[in-house]
A protein has these predicted regions:
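Cytosolic juxtamembrane helix and N-cap/initiation of the first transmembrane helix
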Residues: 2-35
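Hydrophobic transmembrane helix segments
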Residues: 31-59
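Core segments of alpha-helical transmembrane spans in multipass integral membrane proteins
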Residues: 50-85
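Non-cytosolic membrane-interface motifs at loop->transmembrane helix junctions
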Residues: 51-53, 119-132
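Juxtamembrane helix-break-helix junctions at the cytosolic face
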Residues: 81-96
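Hydrophobic alpha-helical membrane segments
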Residues: 97-114
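Membrane-water interface at the C-terminal end of transmembrane alpha helices
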Residues: 135-154
Length: 157
């Protein structure tokens, strides 16, 4: 059953899990896309203005490198957000798999903070988010496994 929910034989637009996990997934889509655009569009990519990485103390080349990496990170987040959005509008049976991916991402973000810490002037919002989103992802993954009424679009063939 675990595998059947994560990797259904037929991918459809039917969602049979708890509605809370679905609506929370919608909120995560919005957060992911907005966050990605911030990293891509802010002049510093959010590296100093949000994450408080002291790039103003770096050489011009190092500062440009950090900003470029933040842009690429934003681009990867945008791609993830678009995949989440496609799942939400067309392939809802994959929502449990998306919650698994979401949870794994935040587990590795947390581990990276211990393994390869980044110098910041303050606690970055993402660092706090790791401690919130890991339990949230686990709870939503669990709820997405709970059978409830079928939710689908009229186009779900």
């Amino acid at each position: 059953m675990v595998t059947a929910k994560l990797l259904p034989e037929q991918v459809t637009n039917e969602y049979n899990g708890n509605i809370i996990a679905l609506y929370t997934f919608y909120a995560i889509i919005g957060m992911t896309i907005v966050r990605s655009l911030i990293h891509m569009l802010l002049p510093d990519g959010g590296s100093e203005s949000i994450a408080s990485i002291p790039i103003d103390t770096y050489s011009t080349e190092a500062e440009s490198t950090v900003i470029g990496i933040f842009f690429l990170w934003g681009l990867s987040q945008l791609i993830i957000g678009v995949i989440y959005f496609i799942v939400a509008i067309r392939y809802k049976s994959l929502v449990p798999l998306m919650w698994l991916f979401f949870t794994i991402e935040y587990i590795f973000r947390l581990l990276m903070g211990f393994y390869k810490p980044i110098e910041t002037n303050e606690t970055a919002p993402g660092e706090v988010g790791n401690f919130i989103f890991i339990p949230l992802g686990l709870i939503m993954l669990y709820l997405s496994y709970q059978t409830s009424s079928n939710i689908s679009n009229s186009n779900s063939k």
